[in-house]
Curated annotation (Swiss-Prot):
FMN binds at residues 63-68, 78-79, 85, 107, 142-143, 186, 196. This is Pyridoxine/pyridoxamine 5'-phosphate oxidase 1. Homodimer. Its EC number is 1.4.3.5. It comes from Hydrogenovibrio crunogenus (strain DSM 25203 / XCL-2) (Thiomicrospira crunogena). Keywords: Flavoprotein, FMN, Oxidoreductase, Pyridoxine biosynthesis. Belongs to the pyridoxamine 5'-phosphate oxidase family. Pathway: Cofactor metabolism; pyridoxal 5'-phosphate salvage; pyridoxal 5'-phosphate from pyridoxamine 5'-phosphate: step 1/1; Cofactor metabolism; pyridoxal 5'-phosphate salvage; pyridoxal 5'-phosphate from pyridoxine 5'-phosphate: step 1/1. Substrate binds at residues 10-13, 68, 125, 129, 133, 192-194. One of its GO terms (biological process) is pyridoxine biosynthetic process. The keyword NADP does not apply. InterPro entries: Pyridox_Oxase, Pyridox_Oxase_CS, Pyridox_Oxase_N, Pyridoxamine_oxidase_dimer_C, Split_barrel_FMN-bd.
Length: 216
C-alpha cells in the first residue's frame, strides 16, 4: 500500500460570516434559510445528508441518503426497514444527520431520535416516485449479499412486466422521522477561525432553544 499524505490539500473559507445577530431563534427556520440558499447556489444534491446510526456493539455507521421532508416535527427520509440501517434504528433510535455544502463553506449537524412515519405517509410518498424507483424498492433485499448485478437486473425486468395495479408499497419499506434535540450550524472562515453555533434544549419540556457560540 503506497503511503500518501494530503497535508497540502487545503483552501481558505470565505463565502460568508455567521454572527449571532444573523441567526433565527428557531433552528428549523435557520435550517430552512440555509437549505434554500443551498438549493439555489449548489450544483446538485443539496438535500443529501449523512445519516449516522449505531449498531448493538457500539459501532457507528454512516451513509448518504436524501432528505425528503422537513417541518417543525422533524426530518424525514425513506429506506428499507429490514436493512442494516433499519435494524440499527430498531436497536437504538438515537441518530445524527449531517448536511455539508462545500460551495457555501457550510455544514449543519442535527441529533435526535428516529421513529417510523405513519404508514399512509410512506405509501403516499412511495406512489409519488417514478415506477422504476418503486420497483427497485420492492425487489431489493437491502444490505443482503447478492451474487451478481445480473440477478438484480433480472428481478427488475420481471417486476416491470407486472401490471401497475399490482404495485403496492412493500411493508418492509417506509419513512423515518428524526425529532431533533440538537442543532449545530458551522460556517467556514479564514484562518480556520470558523463560526459555530449550537441550538440546544435544556430539558425535554423546554420549548425554547438556547443558542451558544462554540470555539472552532
Amino acid at each position: 500500500m503506497p503511503n500518501r499524505d494530503y497535508h497540502a490539500e487545503r483552501r481558505e473559507y470565505g463565502f460568508a460570516a455567521l454572527r449571532r445577530a444573523d441567526l433565527q431563534t428557531d433552528p428549523f427556520h435557520q435550517f430552512s434559510d440555509w437549505m434554500e440558499t443551498a438549493l439555489e447556489k449548489t450544483q446538485q444534491d443539496a438535500t443529501a445528508m449523512s445519516v449516522s446510526t449505531v449498531s448493538a456493539d457500539g459501532q457507528p455507521h454512516s451513509r448518504i441518503v436524501l432528505l425528503k421532508t422537513f417541518n417543525s416535527d422533524g426530518f424525514i427520509f425513506y429506506t428499507h426497514y429490514d436493512s442494516d440501517k433499519g435494524q440499527q434504528i430498531d436497536q437504538n433510535a438515537k441518530a445524527a444527520l449531517l448536511f455539508f455544502w462545500p460551495e457555501l463553506d457550510r455544514q449543519i449537524r442535527i441529533e435526535g431520535s428516529l421513529q417510523k412515519v405513519p404508514r399512509e405517509t410512506s405509501e403516499a410518498y412511495f406512489h409519488s416516485r417514478p415506477k422504476d424507483s418503486q420497483l427497485a424498492a420492492s425487489i431489493s433485499n437491502q444490505s443482503q449479499p447478492v451474487a451478481s448485478r445480473d440477478i438484480l437486473e433480472a428481478k427488475l425486468q420481471e417486476a416491470m412486466s407486472l401490471p401497475d395495479r399490482n404495485l403496492t408499497c412493500p411493508a418492509h419499506w417506509g419513512g423515518y422521522q428524526l425529532k431533533p434535540c440538537y442543532f449545530e450550524f458551522w460556517q467556514g472562515r479564514p484562518s480556520r477561525l470558523h463560526d459555530r453555533f449550537r441550538y440546544q434544549r435544556l430539558s425535554k419540556n423546554d420549548q425554547a432553544w438556547q443558542i451558544t457560540r462554540l470555539n472552532p
